[in-house]
Amino acid sequence: MTNFYCEALTALRSAPHHYLKEVGDQWRTPDLLFWGVNAMFGPLMLDLFADDSNAKCPVWYTAEDNALTQDWSGRLAELGGAAYGNPPYSRSQYHEKQAITGMTHIMNYAAAQREKGGRYVFLVKSATSETWWPEDADHVCFIRGRIGFDLPEWFKPADDKQRPTSAFFAGAIVVFDKSWAGERFSYINRAELEAKGRAFMSLAQFAAGKGDIA
């Protein structure tokens, strides 16, 4: 499905150079953070908000797919594991009356998919005062220490000033899973989360070197 959001994104990717202010929704999850989240709440098999160059999971939805129109629960039933989201924070936008962005829409959709079954894990800004903050999440793990995100692979800086210097913020891992039986809240230091990610990446590399899984 194409819409004005997808068309603008395609044009941005193909531009000869870029400015940081243009990145918008396209910041990537750093590998260590993703694998740390995976170690804690995975296996993460479905990336809800990705593109072909930055997907973190074996299966993913692109902007053209519009995750807010997909059956996450049904897809996870086929794949096994959990879904992951580094969601877009742009204001709510619609195409033919269907939401295509907006954190409130995303969190509400996650809550609805939760009722159908499955685990949905989001790495988000720790913004408890925002109207989109999911008070009904089954678990929230607050990250001690500010986190940052990576530029998209297609980003070509227009000049030397286009380097991220302050894209760090308080973060949290939000889990929707009606089978969750643990505590409602927890905390983890960023360094510990990254250490979990580093260990999991080492394990994955070791397993890949052993050949096919039986």
Residue ranges of model-derived segments:
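Class I S-adenosyl-L-methionine-dependent methyltransferase catalytic core
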Residues: 1-214
